[in-house]
Amino acid sequence: MRRHVFLVGLLIGGSAVASAQRPAPQHVDVPTIAPRPEDVATIDGILRAFYDVISGPAGQPRQWSRDRTLYIPDVHFVSLSTDSTGRVRADVVTHQMFVDRSNPSLVRRGFFETEIHRTTARFGNVVHVFSTYEMRERAGGPVFGRGINSIELFWDGTRWWIAAAQWDDERPDNPIPTEYLP
């Protein structure tokens, strides 16, 4: 038992050291701009922009200022994954944290996320969307992954806002159900 506790202590300590040695993401400046009316006037418009702003070829800067206009100021994103033991991990980040962490790889490698199916539930001014996506490194290139974005939106009387977004990628143990496929 004591050996087990010691090994766990080493693993935890080692993880802390590894984390401390990992460089912090470089801050990406995201100037504030006005939203494009066509991006926020309809559910279709805001979801089209949701995918458009993050997609682009290698070397092309992403449209982070435009992206920020889609969300409430304190939006949080939740990325779900499963570790090697099968335990679910939820990584909760702000918009700025998401931009800082994802920008280098998106710009270096290229990334295209495309909606392939949508299920929408609406009550009054509240909407929930399950948006199934495919991911590619090049426009029209091979699909390297799929998943579902779960997006909460609301209408404030003048425009649509995304209040929260969470997603999970398809895996062998987590196939996309047929009702969320085209």
Where do the protein language model's features map onto the residues?
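Hydrophobic pocket/interface hotspot
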Residues: 50, 67, 75, 129, ...
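Short, low-complexity N-terminal intrinsically disordered segments enriched in polar/charged residues
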Residues: 21-69, 180-182
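Surface-exposed, charged secondary-structure patches
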Residues: 76-77, 81-84, 88-142
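Short beta-strand edge/turn micro-motifs at domain boundaries
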Residues: 21-26, 146-175
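Bacterial N-terminal signal peptides
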Residues: 5-15
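Early exported N-terminus immediately downstream of N-terminal targeting peptides
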Residues: 59-60, 64, 68-87
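Structured segments of extracytoplasmic/periplasmic soluble domains
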Residues: 49-57, 70-78, 101-105
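N-terminal secretory signal peptides that target proteins for export/translocation
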Residues: 1-2
